[in-house]
């Protein structure tokens, strides 16, 4: 059974303070982690806005009909909680999809840094979270 994976970086790397999200750094990161899937730049941030992504990382899993079956965390690890990064939450969702089972019922939101939006182009859904 096969699934397609794509990594999308929607952060605005044009601002000097977000240089860690540059294409050069993305290539280095992907090489160091052994990514064997496309890792692309969402230059105009339209992918993030279309998916209503809020943070990095944010995980979305779609079935073969392009229906969203999972949106949530990679796993329960958080800085300082001593839970190992193992991908358990996303893995459970993928396993359910590949085994033609119902999507996992518990879908906890991702935790991470906010997407670095282009100045003045923050989507309404993001601005409403800040208020």
Where are these regions (language model features)?
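Short, thiol/selenol-centered motifs that function as redox-active sites or metal-ligating centers
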Residues: 13, 18-19, 59, 111-116, ...
């Amino acid at each position: 059974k096969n699934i397609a994976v794509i990594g999308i970086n929607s952060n605005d790397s044009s601002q000097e303070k977000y240089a860690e999200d540059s294409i050069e750094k993305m290539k280095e990161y992907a090489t160091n982690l052994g990514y064997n899937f496309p890792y692309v730049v969402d230059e105009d941030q339209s992918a993030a806005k279309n998916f209503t992504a809020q943070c990095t990382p944010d995980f979305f899993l779609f079935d073969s009909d392009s229906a969203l079956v999972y949106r949530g965390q990679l796993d329960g690890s958080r800085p300082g909680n001593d839970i190992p990064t193992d991908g358990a939450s996303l893995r459970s969702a993928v396993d359910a999809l590949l085994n033609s089972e119902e999507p996992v019922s518990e879908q906890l939101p991702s935790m991470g840094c906010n997407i670095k939006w282009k100045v003045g182009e923050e989507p309404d859904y993001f601005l409403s979270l800040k208020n």
